[in-house]
Structures are given as C-alpha cells and as structure tokens.
C-alpha cells in the first residue's frame, strides 16, 4: 500500500495539520481523509499544492508499506 507522509513531514518541519489545512483549498473532511491516507485517489493539483506548501519533491510525500487495506 502507498500512503502519504504528510503528517510525518509536518512534524519534521514543526508545523501542524491545522496550519496545512489553512494553506489548502479543500473542505476539512476531504483534507483530513487525504492526510490520513483514507482516500483512494488524490488530484494532481492537490499533490502539486502539497509539494509547494511543504517545500518538498512530490516523491517525498509518499511511502510504500506492507500493509494491505
């Protein structure tokens, strides 16, 4: 399974999930699903926004896990 590392990146940067939510143009429900890897798809524009806001390459936003959903 592939999951987003957004929460880990925020922690590394000393920022909060709420801070990121305020930067994104999403409803809180959709934002929360996305950062908690509870969604089956992510729009490219959201990946681009995450990459720019968190100042990291898109590839660093993901990690592969052995976990199956």
What do the PLM-derived regions correspond to, one by one?
Residues 39-49:
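Short, basic-rich loop-to-helix N-cap that marks the start of a DNA-contacting helix
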Residues 15-33:
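Short alpha-helical DNA-recognition segment
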Residues 8, 33-34, 62-69:
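Short, charged recognition helix plus adjacent turn
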Residues 1-16:
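A short, Lys/Arg-rich alpha-helix, primarily the initiator
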Residues 7, 18, 48, 59:
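Residues within the helices of the helix-turn-helix
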Residues 10, 21, 51:
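The alpha-helix within a helix-turn-helix
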